[in-house]
Amino acid sequence: RMIYDGDILIAQKGSLKARKRRLSFKDYQVLACDINFEAPTKTEIKIEEDFSKDLEEFGQAASLALFDYKRKSRSKGFVLSLSGGADSSCIAILVAEILRNGLSELSKEALGKKLGIDIKENDTRADLTGKILQTAYQGTKNSSNETFESAKALAESIGARFYHWNIDDEVNSYVSTL
């Protein structure tokens, strides 16, 4: 799938005159800028790229993609097997970023409507994360207490609902079947 960044640029003779926010949660953006066509300024074409923001932009793009997926699929939220490792932790944070980024641009009411969730005025961002993200730590005899504690701490810090159970019986059942 593609994620459209929604970037709007207005330039003249290689000079950037105006720019709107990329990766917006808004339905649309409008940008206006005065351009003098009678006496345009002559400038050298200069492209400056700030590569230090690549990771930040990845987070914005991925959280916007998850936001769009939730809206378009009309799902009630996300369920994540949170192992305490880097991969599942990253996904949990990206879901939480939906709310951080969404609330930076939209009112609580507008965001709640788009996400299909009931938002109360006194709900915190963590409360809202708990409404769209449920996590489960599925431990076995091979799991460490460190991964359990890591998963639990992350879920609590972002407000996700956290469940845990042992799945040794299920693992043994699969192993015996094979």
State what each model feature region is:
Residues D54-L178:
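ATP-dependent adenylation/nucleotidyltransferase module used to activate substrates
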